[in-house]
UniProtKB/Swiss-Prot annotation:
Its EC number is 1.8.1.9. Belongs to the class-II pyridine nucleotide-disulfide oxidoreductase family. The gene is TRR1. Its cofactor is FAD. It catalyses: [thioredoxin]-dithiol + NADP(+) = [thioredoxin]-disulfide + NADPH + H(+). PANTHER family: THIOREDOXIN REDUCTASE 1-RELATED-RELATED. This is Thioredoxin reductase.
Length: 325
């Protein structure tokens, strides 16, 4: 099977690209994945409860509901959505070749590929994590920190770098107190961020401390069991939120070694757009965004990728017509 455009990934960036390409009558194919990276089709937002910062929803919207709306809109404008995971992708020449997990014997081709597979937060994998994920445990303070379950409550952040510092400072807007759990006896954060943390009246840093277990009432988390790695003392910290700030992993395994990536595995794009060092291969959303990682910025990135793909195909079609005339 040959397609003009294939989109790999089904988060806001993938579906926004599909909407634009569908409206351009390019009949895009979107592979939404089958539990790719352990996440259901729709990406990270399917694990989020209330989304309060996506424009157009003054009362907020459930993450799965938002992604279902994205999916319906993609289909409405002509995108073909396939629930399968692309397992191999050859970018050595165009048209690009790929195959899926359901049948790795059969290869398909595409003139243009948009990779929108996102990134996933690193987890601690402690007892209670699965029970209280999005019920007290989160990997995004900016996304979830203002939620009612966290407002006016003591909260904890895990990490020691700039991301942990930023998340802790952000949470002070809503929390009565923020505990920062740092595994070592010093911060990895930049000096200016460390200074802000150390002098903030709402923030207490617990040095040499790791989280062992999250506890609660089987509905919401209300406590974290912690351990001092130097003294071996184990205690319970009464907090209603535990935020992970220990980094993200971009889902770029499919193309590593083929396309230019940075040291952390994020795809390098040109001039803030979706173009990569390979003509016809575009990256959108969190696979190339290690800074913002928001649903709305991801959607905007997908828009750029869709428009760039449409423009490239139109230019190539025009050149072909000139050569044939």
């Amino acid at each position: 099977m040959h397609s003009k455009v294939v989109i790999i990934g089904s988060g806001p960036s993938g579906h926004t690209a599909a909407i634009y390409l569908g409206r351009a009558e390019l009949k895009p194919i979107l592979y939404e994945g089958m539990l790719a990276n352990g996440i259901a089709p729709g990406g990270q937002l399917t694990t989020t409860t209330d989304v309060e910062n996506y424009p157009g929803f003054p009362d907020g919207i459930l993450g799965p509901s938002l992604m279902e709306a994205f999916r319906k809109q993609s289909e409405k404008y002509g995108a073909q959505i396939i629930t399968d995971t692309v397992s191999k992708l050859d970018l050595s020449k165009r048209p690009f070749k790929y195959c899926c997990e359901s049948n790795e014997e059969v290869f398909h081709t595409a003139d243009v590929v948009i990779l929108a597979t996102g990134a996933y937060a690193r987890r601690l994998n402690i007892p209670g994590e699965e029970i209280y994920w999005q019920r007290g445990i989160s990997a995004c303070a900016v996304c979830d920190g203002a939620a009612p379950i966290f407002r006016g409550k003591p909260l904890a952040v895990v990490g020691g770098g700039d991301s942990a510092a930023e998340e802790s400072l952000f949470l002070t807007r809503y929390a009565t107190k923020v505990y920062l759990l740092v595994r070592r006896d010093k911060l990895r954060a930049s000096p200016i961020m460390a200074k802000r943390l150390l002098h903030h009246p709402k923030i207490e840093i617990l040095w040499n401390t790791v989280a062992l277990e999250s506890l609660g009432d089987n509905n919401l988390m209300n406590c974290v069991k912690i351990k001092n790695v130097k003294t071996q003392e184990v205690s319970e910290l009464q907090v209603n939120g535990l935020f992970y700030a220990i980094g993200h992993e971009p889902a770029t395994t499919l193309v590593r070694g083929q396309v230019e990536c940075d040291k952390d595995g994020y795809i390098i794009t040109k001039n803030g757009g979706p173009e990569t060092n390979i003509k016809g291969f575009f990256a959108a959303g969190d696979v190339q965004d290690k800074k913002w990682r928001q649903a709305v910025t991801s959607a905007g990135s997908g828009c750029m990728a869709g428009l760039a793909a449409e423009r490239l195909l139109a230019e190539e079609e025009e050149m072909k017509n000139i050569e044939d005339s």
